[in-house]
């Protein structure tokens, strides 16, 4: 049995691939396979996936950027079917030119997806930026050859994000 963790604990240990995060929490994959634990999580997640709300400044920021000529894409380690359902649920379909997710539920990472996405975009690398909330997002942006802005109100703590020596923001308005 694992101990309960706080949001701060979560943000201090969450990692990609997600299997590494499970290990940090104390999972013993010799006793229970990662795929089994991962599917258990997905069952719970599926029942609660629409409980979170968008941050108050999300829609205004997306709309302002879109009106100024910026395009938006989603790059996620989430399963593509679930990701598209979430985008639709939050009525964001018209905001994004590309929605890129994984074919499975195991969140191994998104470097390969990012490289594929950047090839689909009709922009120079210095015209593209990633906004993310994990150290992995920074690594993906580096692999893609683009600028990364990190938000400290997501999966990783401010301290972890600052360790990447990049810009870290607490809201879209400060971005």
Task: Enumerate the predicted regions with their spans.
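N-terminal helical cap/lid subdomain that shapes the substrate entry/recognition surface
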Residues: 1-56
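Conserved H-loop
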Residues: 3, 28, 93-97, 124, ...
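A short, structured active-site edge motif that brings together acidic residues
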Residues: 9-13, 93-108
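Short, acidic loop-to-helix structural element flanking the phosphoryl-transfer center
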Residues: 46-74, 80-87, 111
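Surface-exposed amphipathic alpha-helices with a cationic face
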Residues: 59-66, 118, 138-142
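Structural recognition of alpha->loop->beta junctions
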Residues: 90-102, 160-175
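Conserved Lys-Pro-Asp/Glu-containing loop-to-beta segment of HAD-superfamily phosphomonoesterases
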Residues: 110-139
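Acidic, Mg2+-coordinating phosphoryl-transfer loop and its flanking beta/alpha structural elements
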Residues: 129-170
């Amino acid at each position: 049995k694992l101990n309960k963790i706080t949001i701060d604990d979560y943000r201090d240990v969450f990692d990609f691939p997600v299997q590494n995060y499970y290990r940090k929490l104390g999972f013993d994959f010799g006793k229970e396979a990662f795929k089994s634990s991962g599917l258990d999580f997905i069952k719970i997640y599926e029942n609660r996936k629409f409980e979170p709300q968008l941050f108050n400044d999300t829609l205004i920021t997306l709309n302002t950027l879109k009106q100024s000529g910026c395009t938006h894409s989603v790059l996620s380690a989430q399963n593509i079917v679930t990701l598209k359902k979430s985008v639709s649920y939050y009525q964001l379909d018209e905001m994004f030119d590309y929605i890129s997710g994984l074919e499975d539920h195991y969140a191994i990472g998104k470097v390969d997806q990012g490289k594929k996405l950047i090839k689909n975009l009709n922009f120079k690398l210095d015209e593209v930026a990633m906004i993310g909330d994990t150290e992995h997002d920074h690594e993906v942006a580096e692999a893609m050859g683009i600028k990364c802005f990190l938000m400290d109100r997501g999966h990783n703590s401010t301290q972890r994000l600052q360790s990447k020596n990049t810009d870290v923001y607490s809201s879209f308005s400060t971005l």
